[in-house]
A protein has these predicted regions:
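Intrinsically disordered, low-complexity segments enriched in serine/proline and basic residues
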Residues: 4-10, 14-17
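A glycine-rich beta-to-alpha transition motif near the start of alpha/beta enzyme domains, typified by
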Residues: 18-136, 175-294
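Active-site glycine-rich loop that binds ribose-phosphate moieties when present
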Residues: 145-164, 191
């Protein structure tokens, strides 16, 4: 399987040594991709022969000792029959996640290249079925119906009571508006909100949102499961766009600049006070392929 910008395969013996995994039990062929800087390891598991442990996932995603990624995805058949395919998704800390917007675009592009699929395709996630369509080098994924909207909640933080809004766009997100995203305390405040009792038991992702203009925002995200800032978060920018529509009168499509510099686009409709037909559009780029002993 050949992809654009393919690099030399990683030496499996070397990688086994780096990971401390000893003798290779299996050679994992992978593809590295990114969606607006949010990067992922993808692999073909249609025969379901690959079963990675949490420790192996953490090693693979480690940026100094492994391949490096925000998450890892395996392509598997869809047992429910609700979609063409299904995914196995894990964050870089080994935890599973219901949904990932940037990951979904990369996953769709990966399926297209791997299978030769033409036209739209669907795959099942823990959040529901995702439909993807392609337009040149950009991918649009239709997201599941948002739920759990909460607005204007005063949450007690170390910096004092802070107004936070929240919405689940496949995974939970908290929204904090800031005057200047460059000055947002993403690491400190992000970690505090992520683990705050207000969002127990599983915590939340945290997005710092700066309004840049009409229907245009900038977003920085502290991601649960990565436990730090990422260059982009698709479900996060979607939550930020929808809450900006509700609170700031934004109309679709909403343009969102992420920390990596890319522009994403969120489209939607509002019916009877609810958001429907929510979709996220952005890049999904191949970086390289390789193989590693696991």
């Amino acid at each position: 399987m050949q992809f654009p910008n393919q690099a030399a395969a990683i030496n499996p013996g070397l990688m086994a040594s780096v990971f401390g995994l000893g003798c290779a039990a299996m050679l994992l062929e992978f593809t590295k991709m990114n969606g607006a800087g949010n990067d992922f390891i993808l692999f073909d598991n249609r025969d379901r022969k690959i079963s990675l442990t949490t420790a192996q996932i953490v090693h693979l995603c480690h940026r100094q000792r492994g391949i490096g990624a925000d998450g890892i995805m395996g392509l598997v058949p869809c047992d429910s029959g609700k979609a063409d395919w299904s995914w196995q998704f894990h964050n870089s800390d080994g935890s599973s996640a219901e949904m990932c917007g940037n990951g979904a675009r990369c996953f769709a592009r990966y399926i297209q290249k791997l299978t030769g699929a033409t036209g739209d395709l669907t795959f099942e996630t823990a959040a529901g079925v995702i439909r993807a369509r392609f337009n040149g080098d950009r991918v649009t994924v239709g997201l599941t119906k948002p739920h759990g909207l909460r607005l204007n909640e005063a949450v007690a933080l170390q910096q004092g009571p802070t107004e936070i809004h929240s919405l689940n766009t496949g995974v939970p997100h908290a929204i904090v508006y800031v005057d200047d995203a460059d000055k947002a305390m993403v690491a400190g405040v992000g970690a505090e909100v992520r683990h705050h009792a207000h969002f127990k038991p599983r915590g939340t992702n945290v997005n710092f949102v700066q309004v840049k203009g009409p229907d245009f925002i900038r977003v920085r995200t502290y991601e649960r499961g990565v436990e730090g800032e990422t260059l982009a978060c698709g479900t996060g920018v979607t939550a930020a766009a929808l809450i900006s529509a509700r609170l700031r009168g934004f109309t679709p499509p909403v343009k969102v600049q992420v920390q990596g510099g890319d522009l994403l686009e969120v489209s939607f409709r509002e019916e009877n006070g609810e958001f429907t037909d929510v979709a996220l559009t952005g890049p999904a780029d191949f970086a390289f392929t390789g193989s590693v002993s696991v």
